[in-house]
Amino acid sequence: MPTINQLIRKPREAQKARDKAPALQSSPQKRGVCTRVYTTTPKKPNSALRKVAKVRLTNSYEVIGYIPGEGHNLQEHSVVMIRGGRVKDLPGVRYHILRGVLDTQGVKNRKQRRSKYGAKRPK
């Protein structure tokens, strides 16, 4: 515990807020190329095969992005758009891949929350 005099000589330094999505470099989205598309298992107590992709961004960061929705068409060398947002039960996955943008197709037969999954309005 510092004394009053010590605090007058050298005030307390405010802690800097840590960026939750550093690879975006303050952009809303970033473009990148898939280097590997694979499935991984979530941590306890959940159980599934979550679809993820390793993406090399235009700023040469390499990040892991989650592919939301049922089914996807991504493979190696697909060009994707990435946004921030982690997946709580997948350690190391801090980004989401946007559906219906660039090489990523929207989710088929999606009726609700369509804008989040790049699905057109059904006729």
UniProtKB/Swiss-Prot annotation:
UniProt keyword annotations, A-Z: Methylation, Ribonucleoprotein, Ribosomal protein, RNA-binding, rRNA-binding, tRNA-binding
Keyword Coiled coil: no
InterPro entries, per database record: NA-bd_OB-fold, Ribosomal_uS12, Ribosomal_uS12_bac
A GO cellular-component term linked to this record: small ribosomal subunit
Residue(s) carrying 3-methylthioaspartic acid: D89
Leader peptide range in chain numbering: none
Subunit structure: Part of the 30S ribosomal subunit. Contacts proteins S8 and S17. May interact with IF1 in the 30S initiation complex.
Biological role stated in the UniProt entry: With S4 and S5 plays an important role in translational accuracy.
Protein name in UniProt: Small ribosomal subunit protein uS12
Organism lineage string: Bacteria, Pseudomonadati, Pseudomonadota, Alphaproteobacteria, Hyphomicrobiales
Protein encoded by which gene: rpsL
